[in-house]
Amino acid sequence: MKPLLTPLACALAALCITGCAHGPAAAPATTDLALPTAWAERPGDATPDWAGLLDPQLAALQARALAANRDIALAAQRWKQAQLLVEQSALRWSPSAGVSANASRPVQTQSSTRNVDIGGVTVPVTTATGWSRSYGASVGVSYELDLWDRLAQGTAAQRAQAEAARTDIAAARLSIRSQVAEAYWTLAALQAQRPLAEAQITLTRETLELTRQRVREGKLLPIELDKIAVNLQAAESRLADLSADAQLQRHILALLLDEPLPGPQPDATLPAAAPPRWRLAAPADVLAQRPDVQRARLGVDAALAKLRVSEAERYPRLSFSAGLSTGGTTASDWLAQPLASFAANLVVPMIDWQRLDLQREGARTELDTTALTLRDTLQKALADIESQRIEAERAAQQWQANAGRLREATENERLAQLRYEVGAVARADWLQTRSALLDAQQAEIRLRLTQWLRQSSLFKSLGGA
């Protein structure tokens, strides 16, 4: 008796079981990087809460920008395209089927013969008339076993690339929110400084006239006029800068909101208090939230999956196909003449080793490159966060130092006004102290703006809060 299974059939059965046992493998974790366990700067006392820092008008502007911005829309389209590629790659896991049908109408082979007399010679002539019809149909199915996870790793690479495209959306949204907040707060600071700058110009002009009169009376040297004139020119230039900067910030908002120029003119308000000092989580947890770090990590996952695909290309492939076809000139022929087929196809790479070696080395080089990119991204991200915290601390110290100057200027202006009212000092002297107070008030607004801009930059560097 012949054995039921030949050695080749046993080998094919074993390969089938092996192929069914493997599924899509998730990209493994890369080598852990040495990250600090704590931040260099002293921790804050407030839980990061970006939404709690926004007034309703700013929150509404951010929502409009997120809905209308073109950069976010383009990133979303790229992510959608990447998802479609993942779905196409996943189809390789499913059997592929095909159906075909055909119909023909050749000239009828039935013929008639008659004799024709040509020059006394009888020649038989055959003629064919009429048409015949025949029909056929076939159906087939094929399936490739993923013996070495080649298809699974190819899908994993596509999935990692799609997730990397998704991080672009998060990065764009984060950037837009930060830019809208910065433009809004800058516009608010400019609007708050404008009445102070106008009042300072009025005071300086009056001081200039009083000084000119005292110079004519011989009470002051002419050089004092030049000093006041320089102060007036600086005050007028500052007011012009405020107007120009306000227009530029409106243009920025127009671009972010996808609106026509000159852009919106909101009644912006700069927060009266300094921003809170945030208490950050562990560096590893914070870095994991950044879109650029996520993209770099996904790049490593995709490169690792591609390397595994290149390794699997070196091993045999096994696929199966089955088909059923039939046809004929009549309906009875369809049932009487079916043809079924089954085939197993084993492809073994034997003479293409040089190309496969180069392909594997290219994939390994790509993996090394993405690993270095991940390390570089982590180091730069860590330095960026620490730098933003240092800048925020510097802005806070500058604001505190100016608070002392503002208190001194306020007290000096109060005393000068009292002395002027009792005739102890001239009006020009009192106006100068009042101008110094306006300088300190404008500096306080600028330093408070700097603090909030640093807070926005810190929010962006943290990957959202």
Regions found by a protein language model. Name each.
Residues 68-69, 217, 422:
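Charged, alpha-helical scaffolding/interaction elements associated with membrane systems
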Residues 87-88, 108-110, 237-240:
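Secretory-pathway/luminal and periplasmic proteins that interact with or process carbohydrate-rich
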Residues 216-244:
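Repeat-solenoid scaffold signature
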Residues 2-67, 115-117, 159, 243-288, ...:
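Terminal intrinsically disordered/low-complexity segments used for targeting and assembly
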Residues 74-89, 172, 176-213, 228-231, ...:
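Amphipathic alpha-helical coiled-coil segments
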Residues 56, 76, 93-171, 277-285, ...:
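Small/polar-residue-enriched beta-strand and adjacent coil segments characteristic
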